[in-house]
């Protein structure tokens, strides 16, 4: 079976672990999952968080997925490298290098240095990511949504000048923690971007396409902003099943509620599902999974309530199983 997942953020990476657990891939590899009929997992990963910082290209969501699936993630933070040290950050601070609100760990810095060297040599991000994954063996194909620049920027009211200005998503997220007056999001460069090699084929050839319970605005929304992806979703023969990131009116991780409020969408499973919309209309969903005890009425979308707490890979695998079942696909 071929499974393609649109994903971003820490929660999305943990969702991929559940997919692997169900399919017997990666660190959960089983003998019965090997051979010519082995399952295949492809992740189309958000690049809207990507930025140049300290002279290196940082791709937070790609790295979080790679480290998580490769066993190198910091288990407490859910992002960054396991057993990290911070000597480079301390030295940069001693030199007074800006920005002082963003830090890179020493081990993580090595990843960014390799990536930046390859990008400057002319390799596209998709090939760079493939090369980095050779070290981590993530047990899945990780594809950036695009090789082109497509960055999420945020229009805020500057707390110091009281004037509107646009800042990179990383500054809004890390420096301000989304606690400044926020007016809109813009996916800078997305209109001129193209999908990375393999992305539309992964969607077209899939037996099922899953939307991870990632941030609907700045993770999944950023992916959908790239021309060609929404069209691929609408035309694939695979069923598209989404997972609500909202439980009891709140996201479990991140700031999806703040992002949703900016675009005028309520922090409910039903509102997010309606935001994605039914594929039978102008949207992208065939099915929508909400947390047990929750409900949603979305015309043209089959809704099912199941446990959506990703407490461990085995529990998350049951979430994935429910989505595959809703799609009518047999493992």
From Swiss-Prot:
Pfam families: CofD
CC cofactor: Mg(2+)
UniProt xrefs under HAMAP family: CofD (MF_01257)
Known function: Catalyzes the transfer of the phosphoenolpyruvate moiety from enoylpyruvoyl-2-diphospho-5'-guanosine (EPPG) to 7,8-didemethyl-8-hydroxy-5-deazariboflavin (FO) with the formation of dehydro coenzyme F420-0 and GMP.
Protein name stated in the entry: Phosphoenolpyruvate transferase
Keyword field: Magnesium, Transferase
One BP annotation, GO: F420-0 metabolic process
CDD domains, A to Z: CofD_like
Catalytic activity: enolpyruvoyl-2-diphospho-5'-guanosine + 7,8-didemethyl-8-hydroxy-5-deazariboflavin = dehydro coenzyme F420-0 + GMP + H(+)
Molecular function terms, GO-annotated: LPPG:FO 2-phospho-L-lactate transferase activity; magnesium ion binding
Highest taxon in the source lineage: Bacteria
EC number: 2.7.8.28
Oligomeric form and interacting partners: Homodimer.
Gene3D superfamilies on file: CofD-like domain (1.10.8.240), CofD-like domains (3.40.50.10680)
Annotated 7,8-didemethyl-8-hydroxy-5-deazariboflavin binding sites: 63
Pathway involvement of the protein, from the record: Cofactor biosynthesis; coenzyme F420 biosynthesis
UniProt lineage: Bacteria, Bacillati, Actinomycetota, Actinomycetes, Mycobacteriales
């Amino acid at each position: 079976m071929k499974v393609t997942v649109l994903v971003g953020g820490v929660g999305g990476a943990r969702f991929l672990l559940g997919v692997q657990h169900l399919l017997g891939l990666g660190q959960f590899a089983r003998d019965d999952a090997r051979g010519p009929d082995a399952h295949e997992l492809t992740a189309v990963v958000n690049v809207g968080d990507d930025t140049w910082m300290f002279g290196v290209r940082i791709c937070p969501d790609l790295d979080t997925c790679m480290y998580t699936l490769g066993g190198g993630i910091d288990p407490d933070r859910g992002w960054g490298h396991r057993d990290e040290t911070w000597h480079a950050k301390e030295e940069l601070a001693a030199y007074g290098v800006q920005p002082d609100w963003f830090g890179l760990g020493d081990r993580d810095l090595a990843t960014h240095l390799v990536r930046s060297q390859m990008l400057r040599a002319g390799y596209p991000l998709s090939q760079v990511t493939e090369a980095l994954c050779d070290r981590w063996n993530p047990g899945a194909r990780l594809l950036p949504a695009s090789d082109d620049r497509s960055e999420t920027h945020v229009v805020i009211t500057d707390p110091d000048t009281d004037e509107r200005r646009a800042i990179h998503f990383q500054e809004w997220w890390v420096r301000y923690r989304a606690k400044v007056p926020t007016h809109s999001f813009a996916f800078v460069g997305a209109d001129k971007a193209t999908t990375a090699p393999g992305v539309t084929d992964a969607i077209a050839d899939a037996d099922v396409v899953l939307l991870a319970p990632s941030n609907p605005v700045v993770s999944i929304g950023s992916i959908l902003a790239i021309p060609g992806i929404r069209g691929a979703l609408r035309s694939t023969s695979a069923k598209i099943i989404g997972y609500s990131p909202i439980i009891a009116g709140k996201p479990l991780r991140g700031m999806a509620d703040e992002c949703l409020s900016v675009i005028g969408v309520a922090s409910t499973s039903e509102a997010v599902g309606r935001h994605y919309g039914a594929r039978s209309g102008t949207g992208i969903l065939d099915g929508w999974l909400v947390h047990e005890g929750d409900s949603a009425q979305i015309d043209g979308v089959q809704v099912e309530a199941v446990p959506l707490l990703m407490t461990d890979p085995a529990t998350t695998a049951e979430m994935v199983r429910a989505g595959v079942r809703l799609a009518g696909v047999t493992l």
